[in-house]
Amino acid sequence: MSLREEALHLHKVNQGKLESKSKVEVRNAKDLSLAYSPGVAEPCKDIHEDINKVYDYTMKGNMVAVVTDGTAVLGLGNIGPEAALPVMEGKAVLFKSFAGVDAFPIALNTNDVDKIVETVKLLEPTFGGVNLEDIAAPNCFIIEERLKKETNIPVFHDDQHGTAIVTVAGLVNALKLSGKSMSSIKVVANGAGAAGIAIIKLLHHYGVRDIVMCDSKGAIYEGRPNGMNDVKNEVAKFTNQDRKDGSLKDVIVDADVFIGVSVAGALTKEMVQSMAKDPIIFAMANPNPEIMPEDAREAGASVVGTGRSDFPNQVNNVLAFPGIFRGALDVRATHINEEMKIAAVEAIASLVSEDELSADYVIPAPFDKRVAPAVAKAVAKAAMETGVARITVDPEEVAEKTRKLTIIGE
């Protein structure tokens, strides 16, 4: 069978990828009296007296809503909520498989920002966290920022931050090979959508100061007269301080790092040759990268990462989001802040030892069982240190719990 035939068969024969499963058995009247009436009234009364006990007595503490409006699904674009549902189911499968997090798809039949925000807010009693997924820019930025302010559970747009965290982790290790520092490099990013914006924000937070971002109209700079929006205006305030104009070809000269989250073929061998010596290339357009790895290496690239599993250094969000939510849920975090994201970056990067580090191995493999426990531990610790954790736990216990819950490779 072809990939298409296999994929359709898997989804059809199982009627999707998720089901509801009870943690307790109801075999007799006693079981029924405990799981439902009259016994169920006891946790209800306790939660009514202390709302935080909802985490002790219900699924909330391990349940994430995977929310989409279907406007930016993979490489398929605006295909609507029903067509997005298989992706949301798949995301829930990854949450469970990689970190034991229960997740449920919520595909919303609206693109209205106010309606999406209000709907998610109304779901807060049920879910311990919210993963926003495949929502087009600029709505994705607005929705996330509003929900972070208007709810008290972690809200995380994975298309932005998951990609950013794994990319920066890869760059941390790639720079070890080059001997360069974050504060000294020039970075050119191509693609000003959700992932691109989040990557340069995290890089700036990490100490990178020489950043130029390009979109389809060329270099973004403060005061550019066309093709701007609120998010690009915000980015322009801390990037491209020399206000360079022109195309990607013009601004990439002497850059140390290229980060692409744009379209296939956007980066040419000639552009790579115009960069600084031994440039680092992260070409993450899917299904085909901005430049093929062999072409980038022929042009002088020292390290090349893509979004594909058939090339070395795959930038895969599954290295980030399961462990991030595991750590956040286990401390009952109210938010996922910058410190927690940076902790995730450091945890992922640290799993590649100095002995293992090479041009073809700067990012752990997606099925490396060490990743989710390490990320969960680091994120939980950072949450407690920055005051967004509701409870105190031993970070090592979080790691051990994650190891036991992870079912990949079994």
Curated annotation (Swiss-Prot):
Q: What CDD domains does this protein map onto? A: NAD_bind_2_malic_enz
> What PROSITE patterns does the record point to?
MALIC_ENZYMES
Q: What induces it?
A: Transcribed at a high level under all of the conditions tested.
Q: Which Gene3D superfamilies match?
A: Malic enzyme, N-terminal domain, NAD(P)-binding Rossmann-like Domain
Per UniProt, the cofactor note for this protein states: Divalent metal cations.
Instruction: Return the InterPro entries for the record.
Output: Aminoacid_DH-like_N_sf, Malate_Decarboxylase, Malic_enzyme_CS, Malic_N_dom, Malic_N_dom_sf, Malic_NAD-bd, Malic_NAD-bd_bact_type, Malic_OxRdtase
Q: Which SUPFAM superfamilies match?
A: Aminoacid dehydrogenase-like, N-terminal domain, NAD(P)-binding Rossmann-fold domains
Q: Which UniProt keywords apply?
A: Lyase, Magnesium, Manganese, Metal-binding, NADP, Oxidoreductase
**Pfam name, any one:** malic
For NADP(+), which residues are the binding ones?
Answer: A192, G193, A194, A195, N286, N317
So what does this thing catalyse?
Answer: (S)-malate + NADP(+) = pyruvate + CO2 + NADPH; oxaloacetate + H(+) = pyruvate + CO2; (S)-malate + H(+) = (S)-lactate + CO2
Q: Give one GO molecular function term.
A: malolactic enzyme activity
Q: How is its activity regulated?
A: NADPH is a strong modulator that switches activity from a pyruvate-producing malic enzyme to a lactate-generating malolactic enzyme.
EC number(s) recorded for this UniProt protein: 1.1.1.40, 4.1.1.101
List ligand-binding residues for a divalent metal cation.
Answer: E133, D134, D159
Instruction: Decide whether keyword Thylakoid is in the record.
Output: no
Top-level taxonomic group: Bacteria
Needed cofactors, names only, are: Mg(2+); Mn(2+)
Self-association state and partner proteins as the record states: Interacts with BrxC.
| Chain's role | Bifunctional enzyme with both malic and malolactic enzyme activities. In the absence of NADPH, catalyzes the reversible decarboxylation of malate to pyruvate. Can use NAD and NADP, but with a very strong preference for NADP. In the presence of excess NADPH, catalyzes the non-oxidative decarboxylation of malate to lactate. During growth on glucose, contributes to NADPH balancing via oxidation of the NADPH produced in excess by other enzymatic reactions. Can also catalyze the decarboxylation of oxaloacetate.
Q: What protein family does this chain belong to?
A: Belongs to the malic enzymes family.
Q: What is this protein called?
A: Bifunctional malic/malolactic enzyme
